[in-house]
Amino acid sequence: MSPNTQSETFKRKPVENLLSARSVAIVGASTKGRWPSGIYRNLKAAKFPGNIYLINPNYTEIFDDKCYPNLAALPEVPEHLLMLIPTRAVLSTIEEAAKLGTKAATIYSAGFGEGEDPKGKDRAQAMKELCDRTGFVVCGPNCMGSFSLPEGLWSFPTPVPLLKKGPVGLIFQSGGSLGNWVKGASERGIGFTYAVSSGNEVSLDLVDYLSFLVDEPDTKVITLMVEGIRRPQEFMTVAEEALKKNKPILVVKLGRSEMG
């Protein structure tokens, strides 16, 4: 799928490096906490066909699978990192991964500009510059992962029902709401192509994901849950392309009041 089929004025980043990865490494895999085990179990439940590597220097085995001390110890370069590590270690890990040849990461860790902490904003800017320099793409930080139904790549960290394939693509700027929506929709028989929790959007943003879904042939309807659109002009360019392809875009705007 070409990243520039819509307009010479807009070129999306390679979302497919993230959503269509053929191997993953869970960096910060652990028997402690619900998210590391949740991600592993969701990948297994979805029958992800690629290799799933576990990385944590404090373990030699987790979930009856071998655990490696670091990225360099892996038998191959993973295409996508699922990162559950302290904020202070994230940037150096991305730098190392990019040098090894990894192209994408989902970063669950917070501390990258979502609050008023100026150090967090500095970390977010450093991550953006690192991604721009290396071509690395990131979902998040401070996100809850994604679902790629065609690939069986489910990086969501909490339990979900066994989703079925269908025509709906989702992009949510609220990770918790995404989990509730896919559960509720599944109970009503609705199936999906891709569903993304975009987090802080330091690298990939809503417009990149939307462009991917507009070009994705099996996605017929797109639903967005939006707090804000950072690139309104590019958003309109992509939305016009969706209109040409008869793909409806449904937008749910998150409120800012106490009532929502």
What is each of the regions a protein language model found here?
Residues 1-260:
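Catalytic-core regions of core metabolic enzymes
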